[in-house]
A protein has these predicted regions:
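Trp/Gly-enriched beta-strand surface patches
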Residues: 1-28, 93-94, 99-100, 139-142, ...
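C-terminal amphipathic "assembly/sorting" segment characterized by alternating charged
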Residues: 5-6, 26, 41, 130-135, ...
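Short, flexible coil/linker segments at or flanking structured domains
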Residues: 17-19, 32, 64
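A surface-exposed beta-strand-loop module
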Residues: 23-39
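Non-catalytic terminal regions with compositionally biased, polar/charged low complexity
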Residues: 47-175
Length: 175
């Protein structure tokens, strides 16, 4: 654990960021995995702004299903909410039968209510013009933002400029 002053600019981590230097206290936490760990894994959640008692209560109630946690995909479900980190083009299957693929690195969040899916997609690499998700569901586009649909392939057009890396969100209904 570390809390120390660090200096840098937003441009250091984002090509469209401002180049002026900023000096702020930065809190860091890390786990020392040792040298060359083999077949080692761990999982964790971040729970900000909770007292120790609130955290204990939450820990007793949480019921996560972890479908995959490797170098290709991190996939988790809690109730009707799904979270995915695709490190490369990959596919994963959840315990309730949902199968999802991404053609590129992406971060995806899905919330399912009945036959309606709210899907949020972002590009952690800040380099992609679009991401295609393939689901084992046929969807009807419910709201028309910058997303086109082809069968069970949903193509998300990603933001550029000042908004690069931000999420694109749309709502779909299963056919």
């Amino acid at each position: 654990i570390q809390n120390m002053s660090q200096t840098g600019s937003w441009k250091d981590i984002n090509a469209t960021g401002e180049s002026g230097l900023i000096d702020k206290n930065v809190f860091s936490v890390w786990i020392n995995h040792g040298l060359n760990p083999e077949n080692a894994s761990y999982q964790y959640i971040v729970v900000p702004d909770k007292s120790i008692n609130a955290f204990r209560d939450l820990a007793e109630q949480i019921d996560f299903y972890i479908a995959q946690n490797d170098g290709s995909v991190q996939a988790i479900r809690e109730g009707n909410k799904y979270g995915f980190v695709f490190y490369k083009s990959a596919s994963t299957k959840m315990d309730d039968g949902l199968v999802i693929s991404s053609d590129k690195p992406s971060i995806v969040f899905i919330e399912k209510k009945g036959n309606t899916y709210t899907i949020a997609v972002s590009d952690p690499t800040y380099t992609q013009a679009n991401v295609t998700l393939t689901l084992n569901k046929k969807m009807i586009e419910k709201s028309g933002v910058t997303i086109t649909e082809q069968g069970n392939n949903i193509i998300f057009t990603l933001p550029v400029g000042d908004y690069v890396g931000s999420s694109v969100v749309d709502v779909f209904t299963e056919k």
